[in-house]
From Swiss-Prot:
UniProt name for this protein: Potassium channel toxin gamma-KTx 4.4
Domain notes: The presence of a 'disulfide through disulfide knot' structurally defines this protein as a knottin.
UniProt KW keywords: Disulfide bond, Ion channel impairing toxin, Knottin, Neurotoxin, Potassium channel impairing toxin, Secreted, Toxin, Voltage-gated potassium channel impairing toxin
Function summary: Reversibly blocks Kv11/ERG potassium channels.
One GO term describing the cellular component: extracellular region
Free-text tissue specificity from the UniProt record: Expressed by the venom gland.
GO molecular function: potassium channel inhibitor activity; toxin activity
Keyword hit for Disulfide bond: yes
PROSITE patterns: ERGTX (PS60026)
Length: 43
């Protein structure tokens, strides 16, 4: 789910990141972005 994406994904400080994107899409969201090394999912 969405929280697991945030918890397990390390990413670049800013911008899109492939693993976040994949995880967020599996959680049913449109895309994932990075903010300060954490994934954020965009519904």
């Amino acid at each position: 789910d969405r929280d697991s994406c945030v918890d397990k994904s390390k990413c670049a400080k800013y911008g899109y990141y492939y693993q976040c994107d994949e995880c967020c899409k599996k959680a049913g969201d449109r895309a994932g972005t990075c903010e300060y090394f954490k994934c954020k999912c965009n519904p």
